[in-house]
Amino acid sequence: MNRFIMANSQQCIGCHACEVACVMAHNDEQHVLSKRHFHPRITVLNSGAQNSPVTCHHCENAPCALSCPNGAISKRDDSVQVNQQKCIGCKACVVACPFGTMEIIVTPLDNGSAKASAYKCDLCLTRPQGPACIENCPADVLMLATPDVLDNLAKSRRQRTARLEAQPWHSEAVSEETAPTKLQQMHNTPPRGEPDKLAAEERVGHFNEIYLPFRTEQARREASRCLKCGEHSICEWTCPLHNHIPQWIERINAGDILGAVELSHQTNCLPEITGRVCPQDRLCEGACTVRDASGSVTIGNLERYISDQALALGWRPDMSGVSSVGKRVAIIGAGPAGLACADVLVRSGVSVTVYDRHPEIGGLLTFGIPAFKLDKSLLARRREIFTAMGVHFELNCDVGSDVSLSQLQTDYDALFIGVGTYRSMKAGIPHEDAPGVYDALPFLVGNTRHVMGLDATANEPFIDTRGLNVVVLGGGDTAMDCVRTALRHGAAKVTCAYRRDEANMPGSKKEVKNAKEEGAAFEFNVQPVELTLAADGKVNGIRMLRTRMGEPDAQGRRRPVPVEGSEFVMPADAVIMAFGFNPHAMPWLESQGVNTDDWGRIIASVESRYRYQTSNPQIFAGGDAVRGADLVVTAMAEGRHAARGILDWLEVSVPKMH
């Protein structure tokens, strides 16, 4: 008989560790570069409370092999294997497979064509340790079925039956003493613990952070809830930085904060930042195995706890083993992408100088995110840490004005551009440039500069909303930042108006909840048609249409459909437009041969020969300037990938990235 993977579905906890392990086993034990390459050869199906790992059965007289017109599927080493050289991607095997475990993967080729190939479990035939899914299953529900294994399994079941039959028929059922299974641990996990939070009536009076740090007992309790779902867990995969989450949570359990912070910094140079501002509910916590049973582990607050504790103890990155490789790189933009790139480069012995137009590092972390979400002293401390590591900062320096890109190309071996996106998207409705109408980003930047005691700028003035009736248009996290900022400046009323329903808001549920607690009003299913003006030309309201939810769009979100005859005017003294951002104009790029797309985004890809290299070989780019406005962690991940591309291009030999 052929060998195959056998699963005990009754004990499966649905952690998907087998899927992650499978993909990594076929990618040199590294995470794949993007989600579109995540093709596990084993899949965990969920049907209510039951989880079932499913993969190829390696059938005797396999229908897939019998159906293949090119002889690409055959028996080898007691298993059914696909010869990729012979496969023509015809899908005959997909149709023939009775279990639906065959898949066709289309891979783009360098010449512009594509190769379609059959894809299935190969039992990790070339892997010395055997199938990765079995090795990494934390619940031990997978095994490699062979004739000997099946014989032993049948024998053990017969022996158990014999033991039970030896008991008197009127006796109580005999249960054998065994250690708790992972499934039992999951069902016995205590409820999720949230951090303490300042009362709403207190926090609206200042710009201090509203969440209090975990106390040690809170952190230990929350860390104990982690099931440690494999060496490379699904929470690790869904984090764009692939943080070693279960491993540093385990160090918290052991009371080893310094060990935890070392693990944390292997993949993330700003953990005290991402622990505060990352939308964990959409990433790591959203994938947590115990989410449905008792609530996700509070990963973000544990990440914050580790860094806050370790940095308070005096921990700093150890650079004693780093020696210079004689290369110099300039980084344009001290935001998340630029800082992440600088971290990898300086740890690899490269001399790094970071240029930024702002007076402090962080980019929108510092000037776009309000202080009640992110204390600005954290970035100042992190600048001191980077400086001690050897990174040099040129702040208040605008590339293109204060220094030319061509000069930087002359002075440095390579350049990285991580300038973010600063141009606000418009709604395209009448009077959106009238007095009293503000774009979200200049509003937030002007406020942050005011809170930090910095002078206002002409393009980012401080807007005082005291006593005003403020309406914020939009439903993302930036809209919530504007709502909560206006409330703290004493606005008489603040309303968030969004064209879809609450369930389809793109922002964090936590931020919406906080805004409601602080007194914000919400109007859902309303779409702006026109801004109305007073006699003096200043905005005094928004003409709206009611909407209903229609069919899903290309991204799967239901479209808002205007309701005929539902028009009304919403009064407003100030209107803040929070519709997102596009890349701002960078004319100095084109002169150096850096191509951009129709939206103004720099064209660069993680799948290039040198990751995130642009059309100018000396220049690399990443973050929002490449992909458009996105998350802090995605920008950081791209900065790290670009650093690897730069190191490869400069022929600097470094160990594999964690």
Go through the PLM ranges and name each one.
Residues D433-G467, P552-A629:
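FAD-site-proximal beta/loop scaffold in flavoenzymes
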Residues W248, I273-T274, R282-I332, R347-S348, ...:
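FAD-binding core/adjacent interface of flavoenzyme oxidoreductases
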Residues I5-A21, A25, G48-G71, Q81-G100, ...:
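Cysteine-centered iron-sulfur cluster-binding motifs in ferredoxin-type domains/subunits
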Residues C482, A625-S653:
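A conserved FAD-binding loop/helix module that cradles the flavin
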